[in-house]
A protein has these predicted regions:
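Acidic, polar-rich low-complexity tracts and alpha-helical solenoid repeat scaffolds
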Residues: 5, 16-239
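Sec-dependent signal peptide recognition
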Residues: 2-8
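Hydrophobic core
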Residues: 9-14
Length: 239
């Protein structure tokens, strides 16, 4: 919200900064002002086109990066996520050290995050979103967007682990024990902090029991009891 209050003020400043000399092409101020008018009217597609035009026609203007930020955000608001990603790619290519780089990485993550779908489908967008948010956290840990990114990272890790668990349960129903074990172990090893880990440990005890390996089954049962003594999946062990 703070960014766009600043940009709103910028639009008014730009609208009033034209000099007496009029260039043959439209100035950054004129295009930007029209773009912001469309944005405020909710015509995000037209706004995005104009913001993109402003940046493309005046790439060396001091406000070109801001126009590109607004082009990306307008595409995002129009649910044109592929268009928003193209704009953010251009921003990071030409302005990687700009003060708005953390926001652009966050916006990239949100473009993928908004497309995350049913837990029964392939990870796809959730993996891409996670990569963007983790990059933001790593590159700009003190950014105001890093905290929001951290929340999204936790949600996405649980979501992705949920997808793996769904697939592992399906394998177990089909008695495809090797595949199920591989997937369950991946949850335990790479997503240990998620809420899916206790169930993954419990399912591993079932899988190893099913293939006649009681020692391995007992090992995972002990791990479950030690790390999650009061969890519902731990209580199932003794039933």
């Amino acid at each position: 919200m703070k960014k766009f209050l600043i940009l709103t003020a910028l639009a008014y400043v730009l609208a009033g900064c034209g000099g007496a000399d009029v260039a043959p092409e439209r100035s950054m101020a004129a295009i930007y002002s029209d773009a912001y008018e469309n944005f405020n009217d909710g015509d995000y597609e037209a706004a995005a086109d104009l913001f993109s035009q402003a940046e493309a026609e005046h790439p060396t203007d001091p406000y070109a990066p801001d126009a590109l930020v607004m082009a990306a955000y307008s595409r995002y608001m129009d649910d044109d996520f592929s268009g928003a990603l193209i704009a953010t790619d251009r921003f990071m290519r030409f302005h990687p050290g700009h003060q708005d780089a953390p926001y652009i990485l966050y916006l990239r993550g949100m473009c993928y995050y908004r497309q995350v779908s049913d837990v029964r489908r392939e990870p796809g967008m959730s993996v891409y979103a996670l990569q963007q948010f983790e990059q933001l956290r790593e590159r700009f840990p003190s950014s105001e967007y890093a905290k929001n990114a951290e929340n999204k990272i936790n949600i996405l890790k649980n979501y992705i682990a949920g997808k793996v668990m769904y697939s592992a349960r399906t394998d177990m129903k089909r008695e495809n024990w090797t595949s199920a074990i591989t997937k369950l172990q991946s949850v335990v090893q790479t997503a240990a902090e998620t809420v899916m880990t206790p169930e993954a440990l419990y399912r591993l005890t079932q899988c190893y029991t099913a293939i006649g390996l009681p020692k391995q089954s007992s090992g995972y049962a002990d791990m479950l009891r030690k790390n999650y003594p009061d969890n519902q999946w731990t209580k199932k062990l003794d039933k």
